[in-house]
C-alpha cells in the first residue's frame, strides 16, 4: 500500500481494507485506509 500511495496518492473517501490473516488467530486484518488511486481512474 505504501508503494501505491507514494506513486499515486490518496483518494477520498477512506475505505476499509482487509488483509489476509497474518497471525494464527485466523481473523481478517481490517483497518481504515485511504483508497489507492490508480492511474486513469475516473474516481
Swiss-Prot record:
| Keywords annotated in UniProt | Antimicrobial, Disulfide bond, Ion channel impairing toxin, Myotoxin, Neurotoxin, Potassium channel impairing toxin, Secreted, Toxin, Voltage-gated potassium channel impairing toxin
Q: In which tissues is it expressed?
A: Expressed by the venom gland.
Q: Tell me its family.
A: Belongs to the crotamine-myotoxin family.
Query: What is the protein's quaternary organization?
Result: Monomer.
Naturally occurring in which organism (per UniProt): Crotalus concolor (Midget faded rattlesnake)
GO biological process annotation, one example? envenomation resulting in occlusion of the pore of voltage-gated potassium channel in another organism
Reported function:
Cationic peptide that possesses multiple functions. It acts as a cell-penetrating peptide (CPP), and as a potent voltage-gated potassium channel (Kv) inhibitor. It exhibits antimicrobial activities, hind limb paralysis, and severe muscle necrosis by a non-enzymatic mechanism.
Q: List the disulfide bonds.
A: 4-36, 11-30, 18-37
Q: Where are its TM segments located?
A: none
Name of the protein in question: Myotoxin-1
Q: Name one GO cellular component term.
A: extracellular region
The record's subcellular location field reads: Secreted
Under the GO molecular function aspect, what terms does this record hold? potassium channel regulator activity; toxin activity
Amino acid at each position: 500500500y505504501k508503494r501505491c500511495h507514494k506513486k499515486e496518492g490518496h483518494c477520498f473517501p477512506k475505505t476499509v481494507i482487509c488483509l489476509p490473516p497474518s497471525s494464527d488467530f485466523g481473523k481478517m486484518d481490517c483497518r481504515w485506509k485511504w483508497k489507492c488511486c490508480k492511474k486513469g481512474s475516473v474516481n
